[in-house]
Amino acid sequence: MVVSISIRGSLLKVSGNPSRWGRLDNLFGLPTLDSCVSVFNTILAEIGLPQFTKCKRLMPGQAKENEKAPLVADGAIIKEVHITSNRAAGKGNEDDYISGLSTQPYRNSVPRLHSNGKSVDWLSKKGNVNLIYPTVYNKAHEMELHSLTKIKNRFSEQSREYNYLLDIISFCKENGVVRFEQKLKSRFLQKNALNYWGLSDYSILNKLHSDFLELDKKLSVNAMDFETISDHLVSSGVVETTRAANTTAMYAIQWFHGHVFDFNKKQVQTHRARLRKIGIDIAQKCNVSKFSPVIVKQTREIKVQECVAPSWYVRPSHLRVA
């Protein structure tokens, strides 16, 4: 893995994936931002460059007249952060699970299922990346596509390194590993005061990532027959009466058959809000091919669970705190 280091005046910049440094893979990466910076600091120390230090205070910088002075820190500034988690959907279930996720909006972004069915990402309605770039993808496929040939060419097909990577890919396939990843862009970090290493409170990212991982909580409706939507509305507590549920379910049936609604009408807004609580958005065009013939549960059925590293997996050896 390549780490890029650049120096301009007194500005030192390092970019790259620290969880891949000195490793064949990053299926299970570094647990904290501090451990990521620690890897960069180790690299800098080895080549005789100054290491990053934590911010201790913020000071007003220079500004033109009538302009607000920007804040200047006395330590390292974080420009981008990637948060990842692995989920095990079960052997052979990866693509169905990803297809199911592609029916769910996230943070006002629209899902886009890639043509090969191996990944889904979320973009703005104009097709742009906003403050965050979320994606979920088939991890075994990603490693076969981007890592396997490189490792074979570098170490040979008979090498221990190549066969170790094959074992990891087999593990991913046997467990149906899907990767949840969010790339937090610089503007997002600045907007939420998360760019000052040492001063910023990164605990809020736990809630952000938990919300992303819980996208599948509403997916059970995608495996239902439309006749059962009314029952699901009641059991989920969205409505209290069967009559109200049946009325809302009719909107879903009309949507399924291609009906276009007038969202300026109050009753349409009401029924859309109800249906969104169980994972159906009648404001988006119904794509029947995106509805996966499975039931997704946290506890053919997909049982999604935490992906635990096998005992033989080689963990990062550079986990000391920076």
UniProtKB/Swiss-Prot annotation:
InterPro entries from the UniProt entry: G2P_C (IPR022688)
Lineage of origin: Viruses, Monodnaviria, Loebvirae, Hofneiviricota, Faserviricetes
Catalytic reaction annotation: ATP + (deoxyribonucleotide)n-3'-hydroxyl + 5'-phospho-(deoxyribonucleotide)m = (deoxyribonucleotide)n+m + AMP + diphosphate
Highest rank taxon of the organism: Viruses
Known role: Isoform G2P plays an essential role in viral DNA replication. Binds the origin of replication and cleaves the dsDNA replicative form I (RFI) and becomes covalently bound to it via phosphotyrosine bond, generating the dsDNA replicative form II (RFII). In turn, viral DNA replication initiates at the 3'-OH of the cleavage site. After one round of rolling circle synthesis, protein G2P is linked to the newly synthesized ssDNA and joins the ends of the displaced strand to generate a circular single-stranded molecule ready to be packed into a virion.
The name this protein goes by in its record: Replication-associated protein G2P
Stated family: Belongs to the inovirus G2P protein family.
Keywords: DNA replication, DNA-binding, Endonuclease, Hydrolase, Ligase, Nuclease
Pfam family, one: G2P_X_C
EC code: 3.1.21.-, 6.5.1.1
GO biological process: one example: DNA replication
One function term, GO molecular function aspect: DNA binding
